[in-house]
């Protein structure tokens, strides 16, 4: 069984190297073989120019295809896997087109695993851990009012006036600023057209407490079921969101104002111009330390008083091992690949696992990747 790893971009390398160093049978595919050789040429000579047809020729039943390529490749590669009786893993959100492959994958006994990077990925693991711990606690009561928040962000380790730096093309970040979000605030559905319309402050329970700016991201509501909340639980707040350094909204206010005016093809062209400019002005320098902060919080209240309240908090930054972002995206992917090979993940289209044994193993590994990882109990 061969791991067919496609894509050797910035966020892919630590997980790929981990698998090769562990002795797994790994073939590497990348559009630029030179870049792949720079990344892993010291460990392997099994490097191929990425081509879907060439991959199809060598793909065998039981192999695992890993897509660390741009998102539009995930579904075509997953479909190829189904046709060849192979498994598939990516770190990306499950698109409707991917979800549509679930029944076929189940019928064939094949795993199509997604959402197992950082966010989505590690955040899911933390959420599953907290929900399971709450269920097992003496404070559990279906009548409690529950508040769930999950905030993640990549930020510069050393803050800059722009309050942000880019690890790769800024276009994705800029496009996300044009995306609506859906969450629950104070028992009501909150629909927001632009992130800056729902900015709030968040006090992260780090060893040295720190305040960040946060805003809802995408559609949080489907994750209520994904995180195994019972349908009859009373949900006061449920937000999955993005975290930024304090002062970010002030530093970006002119960008927000311009994005508000952009429309159609001309707007897309201007967004690309802005992306190119920001890449010139605000990209990480070679060797510069990045930082990732992730806080997943679950609180249960009775009559307005907290009866259970814990936060899973992580703080990680770039070091001699490379960037925090690359470690935290790609190593969970590598763990999921091993779980697929070990038949520990059910067939079908699935996000990050919720099995307690896998949670313990994966989060244990995250503890080695991050400089700080802790479950904070606010009531002790």
How would you describe each model-predicted region?
Residues 92-112:
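Rossmann-fold NAD(P)-binding glycine/threonine-rich loop
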Residues 41-54:
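Rossmann-fold cofactor-recognition segment
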Residues 63-68, 89-90:
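N-terminal Rossmann-like NAD(P) cofactor-binding module of classical short-chain dehydrogenase/reductase
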Residues 26-39:
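NAD(P)-binding Rossmann-fold cofactor-contacting core
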Residues 3-8:
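Conserved N-terminal Rossmann-fold NAD(P)-binding element of oxidoreductases
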Residues 80-98:
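ADP-ribose/adenylate-binding Rossmann-like module
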Residues 133-380:
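C-terminal catalytic/substrate-binding lobe primarily of soluble NAD(P)-dependent oxidoreductases
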Residues 11-12:
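Hydrophobic/small residue at the entry helix of a nucleotide-binding pocket
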């Amino acid at each position: 069984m061969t791991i067919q790893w496609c894509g050797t971009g910035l966020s892919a390398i630590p997980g790929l190297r981990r698998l090769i160093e562990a002795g797994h049978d790994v073939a590497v595919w990348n559009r630029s073989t030179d870049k792949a050789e720079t990344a892993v040429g010291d460990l392997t000579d099994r490097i191929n120019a990425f081509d879907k047809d060439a991959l199809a020729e060598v793909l065998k039943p039981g192999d695992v295809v890993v897509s660390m390529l741009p998102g539009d490749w995930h579904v075509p590669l997953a479909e190829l896997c189904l046709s060849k009786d192979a498994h598939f893993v990516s770190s990306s959100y499950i698109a409707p087109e991917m979800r549509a492959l679930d029944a076929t994958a189940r019928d064939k006994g094949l795993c199509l695993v997604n959402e197992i990077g950082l966010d989505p990925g590690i955040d899911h693991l933390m959420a599953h851990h907290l929900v399971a711990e709450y269920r097992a606690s003496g404070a559990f009561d279906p009548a409690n009012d529950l508040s769930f928040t999950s905030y993640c962000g990549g930020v510069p380790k050393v803050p800059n006036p722009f309050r942000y730096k880019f690890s790769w093309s800024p276009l994705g970040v800029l496009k996300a600023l044009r995306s609506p979000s859906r969450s629950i605030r104070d028992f009501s559905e909150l629909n927001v057209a632009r992130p800056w319309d729902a900015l709030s402050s968040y006090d992260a329970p780090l060893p040295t407490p720190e305040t960040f700016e946060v805003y809802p991201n995408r559609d949080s509501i489907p994750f209520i079921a994904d995180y195994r909340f019972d349908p009859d639980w009373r949900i006061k707040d449920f937000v999955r969101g993005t975290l930024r350094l304090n002062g970010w909204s002030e530093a970006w206010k002119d960008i927000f104002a311009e994005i508000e005016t952009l429309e159609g093809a001309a707007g897309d062209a201007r967004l690309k111009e802005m992306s190119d400019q920001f890449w010139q002005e605000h990209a990480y320098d070679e060797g510069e330390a990045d930082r990732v902060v992730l806080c997943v919080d679950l609180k249960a209240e009775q009559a307005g008083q907290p009866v259970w309240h814990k936060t899973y908090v992580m703080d990680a930054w770039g070091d001699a091992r490379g960037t925090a972002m690359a470690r935290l995206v790609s190593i969970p992917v590598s763990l999921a690949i091993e779980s697929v090979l070990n038949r520990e993940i059910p067939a079908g289209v699935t996000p990050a696992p919720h099995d307690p044994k896998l949670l313990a193993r994966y989060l244990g590994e995250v503890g080695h990747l991050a400089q700080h990882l802790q479950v904070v109990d606010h009531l002790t």
